[in-house]
């Protein structure tokens, strides 16, 4: 087993991120000392995955105000709000980003009696707490998910909802790591996940380094491996779950869910509760980020289509709740009716 890749670290009063745009060929860690640097790291996907984005943004708030020139507490709180609003523009789909920023803003607005120095300390502690919570949430998701798995089964996953998308264990990959700890032998199939190839460059990399049996397939091979009986379950992560159980996740997830339903294979979604957005009624209201055409036709510095080609590049799609057998959270496994049962998680 190779040394574990650590996507997010806090060292020497700076945010240290593993640059995931360079994987699997280079392992490079980069330090960030400003909110602007964190914004850029999120936007260009040096850090990615809904939980990891949320944690990074939380640290970004602190970095954005730590050098704030001493003034009034009211002006400092306004600056916290400004930095939160700025970081919220980095990527629109992952609800963890907004959840984390709301927590950071609340630290300032709920503690107006503190001095500016005390507020700065409290902001950093809140960011660290969000970081710590994520690791525990992931393990709990893995423990619940493992009750749906058994030794020797074949599991398909899409994109990267692994340790690289969170702080440890991942969400969709958490049961894979825990199964490894139990001595189970799962057979993991990882869709490469066009156009940014997170399944092959990230999921396959981290599972292979952990000694977990993983096979990379192209996205359009999923139907074939299902038809061959190699897949017993599908598990994916998510960037947002609507109140009715519709799920926004990496582009291509919808197609995988349709195939799983056709072949009568259970389709599971691993979702930390901060990813569940009860304020969004259905998947139709989830904003879908559209990214640059170059990701599709010039991925490796050479055009794979005419340069002038029209390109449609949504980063996410929405899987209807009808295709989802269960949503696995740190609080337990949620099944239909999702509208009622998701709401019950927060009561």
Swiss-Prot record:
Catalytic activity: 5-deoxy-alpha-D-ribose 1-phosphate = 5-deoxy-D-ribulose 1-phosphate
EC identifiers of the protein: 5.3.1.-
First-tier enzyme category under EC: isomerase
Alphabetically ordered keywords of this record: Carbohydrate metabolism, Isomerase
Recorded GO MF terms: S-methyl-5-thioribose-1-phosphate isomerase activity
Binding of substrate, residues: 48-50, 91, 198, 249-250
GO biological process, alphabetically ordered: L-methionine salvage from methylthioadenosine; pentose catabolic process
Residues under site feature: Transition state stabilizer: 159
Pfam families: IF-2B
KW Isomerase (keyword) present: yes
Active site location: 239 (proton donor)
The protein's annotated pathway: Carbohydrate degradation
InterPro entries: Deoxyribose1P_isomerase_DrdI, IF-2B-related, IF-M1Pi, IF_2B-like_C, Initiation_fac_2B_a/b/d, M1Pi_N, NagB/RpiA_transferase-like
Family (UniProt): Belongs to the EIF-2B alpha/beta/delta subunits family. DrdI subfamily.
HAMAP family xref list: Deoxyribose1P_isomerase (MF_02229), Salvage_MtnA (MF_01678)
Function, in words: Catalyzes the isomerization of 5-deoxy-alpha-D-ribose 1-phosphate to 5-deoxy-D-ribulose 1-phosphate, as part of a 5-deoxyribose salvage pathway that recycles this toxic radical SAM enzyme by-product to mainstream metabolites.
The name this protein goes by in its record: 5-deoxyribose 1-phosphate isomerase
Species per Swiss-Prot/TrEMBL record: Bacillus thuringiensis subsp. konkukian (strain 97-27)
High-level lineage: Bacteria, Bacillati, Bacillota, Bacilli, Bacillales
